[in-house]
Amino acid sequence: MDMGELPLRAVGTVGLTAAPSADVTSSGIITALTAGENLVFGEVCYIASTGKALKADADAIATSSAIVMALATIAADASGNFILHGIARNDAWAWTVGGLIYLSTTAGALTQTAPSGTDDVVQILGVATHADRMYFNPQLVQVERV
């Protein structure tokens, strides 16, 4: 259910749907950004110095600060929606439920195996709530392996 914009001018609660109803959907805090390259649903991005969203990569600290996930196919230099925090569903995922989800050494990708190479960056991006769903909650603290 899309509720559109909801101004928060009074004390109340904001609920997140724990089970998005369809493949490649989400529920949570969303923002619009400009893609710096072609993106697809589920690819995680950092914000470059240009202000554009680029695929995050755990191979180097300079490209590892994932903060958003693309919520659709977004062409380079086009505006699109990204989730900052919430629940995302992709039926192609096959997570181990309850396991942590990390930034991958493949640009834009997620993994349940923490990167282990020299200079790789370990960043927790969330936890698997179901085989096809994750709680997306990117951590700002990162560890660079030496």
Label each PLM-derived region with a short phrase.
Residues 1-13:
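Register-specific beta-strand positions within repetitive beta-rich fiber domains
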Residues 10-146:
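Glycine-anchored, exposed beta-strand/edge motif detector
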